[in-house]
Amino acid sequence: MNRSALDFRHFVDHLRRQGDLVDVHTEVDANLEIGAITRRVYERRAPAPLFHNIRDSLPGARVLGAPAGLRADRARAHSRLALHFGLPEHSGPRDIVAMLRAAMRAEPIAPRRLERGPVQENVWLGEQVDLTRFPVPLLHEQDGGRYFGTYGFHVVQTPDGSWDSWSVGRLMLVDRNTLAGPTIPTQHIGIIREQWRRLGKPTPWAMALGAPPAALAAAGMPLPEGVSEAGYVGALVGEPVEVVRTQTNGLWVPANTEIVLEGEISLDETALEGPMGEYHGYSFPIGKPQPLFHVHALSFRDQPILPICVAGTPPEENHTIWGTMISAQLLDVAQNAGLPVDMVWCSYEAATCWAVLSIDVQRLAALGTDAAAFAARVAETVFGSHAGHLVPKLILVGNDIDVTEIDQVVWALATRAHPLHDHFAFPQIRDFPMVPYLDAEDKARGSGGRLVINCLYPEQFAGQMRAATASFRHAYPTALRRRVEERWSDYGFGDA
């Protein structure tokens, strides 16, 4: 296994060796400048920036932007994401999804518990804790505050100790030892917090920032309730994640993490959190009261690196990490339910607001169904799952379409979906509350925003196709295509 999957420092060094990292030694300001540079990196698909010289910050502290952004080189577009799993830099979406699904079927490998780890090189306890000494960035001009946690994961455990949950979440700085952030009731952190609330106790909590990249990715995967991400990460990389115990509350966190915050989630205290530029690409103008997270201890490596995601228009990590992990989980859900689905992909360009399902048309024909009945079956299966709850729209295409290629998806959507017959709304299915097009009535009702779009011609339900596709792949004999590819440079096109 490539060590980059289990060691964030190794991951950063690997990016540098690949030419996919820029060491920024020019002084920068955590107040918007770091956010602006990182947003431009996403939008230009430039190398990840590692900021070494941050004004008025803890000496030696650094910030890494765009840790899973896409690259401009099409052949290596997903290399930063692939490196999270120790895969080669030319790996694509299908390679990554295949690896994630294989780990779902593998035996979990429990973490290895250590007495000490690199994250304990520096430990602040009690009154020593001062989060404001770190380069906590204001990422967007509209944000309601500075965000410490945008590319880290919460660590919580059920009161009976049976389930350790790692889940990606955001946290806004309130003061030197307090943060605020959402604990959505339907997500795992909310489920576990409610168990502690019923006991009348605050929730023991930690956050890992700059954790093993594979662990961060797994924490963004909607695994089933009760499944501990640490064991899944072990199965994913083929060896245990090394963990150490926190200083104050008995939780276990990855031993080589850059920064660990620990303390508790308040029973009932809240603070206004947000607004914040979000995964869907918008920043709505009003914040919300969210639970307080009290930090009782802070551990960090020498010269710690704080990774950040500057959320907004795609693609950024909410799409490359979260969207990819959802894709793998939805494929598993669909196939376990017997649906004729051979690939699922949350198009990054759709900001994790739709998933495209590739349908095996021969298997579809064997079902003897039609568009309406099939859409209803897909909706019940997918939207009813934990992963499917997060994605409000599904697009069904034949497997002649490569669902990982957005131009093919858009072509199918424009030319195969009938405006009257192929749009199926499911207003009774509950919604994910952060979907941006939901209005006040939808949110009050908790439903109304679910849609399945059928991009399968009626003939495809019988295993046929209405018309031939006029493309290089479909409109020419195989032997001729190969000859053209082999002679491409002879024609004067170089290696393009």
Swiss-Prot record:
The catalytic activity of this protein is classed by the Enzyme Commission as 4.1.1.93
* Cofactor needs: prenylated FMN; Mn(2+); K(+)
* Bound cofactor: record note: Binds 1 prenylated FMN per subunit.
* Residues that hold Mn(2+) according to the record: 188, 229
Reactions it catalyzes: pyrrole-2-carboxylate + H(+) = 1H-pyrrole + CO2; pyrrole-2-carboxylate + H2O = 1H-pyrrole + hydrogencarbonate
State the SUPFAM superfamilies in the record: FMN-binding split barrel, UbiD C-terminal domain-like
Regulation acting on activity, per entry: Imidazole acts as a reversible inhibitor via the formation of an imidazole-prenyl-FMN adduct. Activity is light sensitive.
Active-site residues (renumbered) = 278
Quick check: keyword Cell membrane in the entry?
A: no
Q: Name one GO cellular component term.
A: cytoplasm
Any idea which positions bind K(+)? 166, 218-219, 221, 229
Provide the induction entry: Repressed by hudR.
Q: How would you classify this enzyme at the top EC level?
A: lyase
Name the job this protein performs: Catalyzes the prenyl-FMN-dependent decarboxylation of pyrrole-2-carboxylate (P2C). Can also catalyze the carboxylation of pyrrole in the presence of elevated concentrations of CO(2) or bicarbonate. Can accept a modest range of heteroaromatic compounds such as 3-methylpyrrole-2-carboxylate, indole-3-carboxylate and furan-2-carboxylate, and shows very low activity with thiophene-2-carboxylate. Attenuates the virulence of P.aeruginosa in a Drosophila model when overexpressed.
Q: Share the domain note from the entry.
A: Consists of three domains: an N-terminal alpha/beta domain, a split beta-barrel with a similar fold of a family of flavin reductases and a C-terminal alpha/beta domain with a topology characteristic for the UbiD protein family.
Note the HAMAP family from the entry. UbiD_FDC
Q: Which family does it belong to?
A: Belongs to the UbiD family. UbiD-like/FDC subfamily.
What is annotated about its quaternary structure and interactions? Homodimer.
Protein name in the entry: Pyrrole-2-carboxylic acid decarboxylase
Organism field = Pseudomonas aeruginosa (strain ATCC 15692 / DSM 22644 / CIP 104116 / JCM 14847 / LMG 12228 / 1C / PRS 101 / PAO1)
Q: Which gene encodes it?
A: hudA
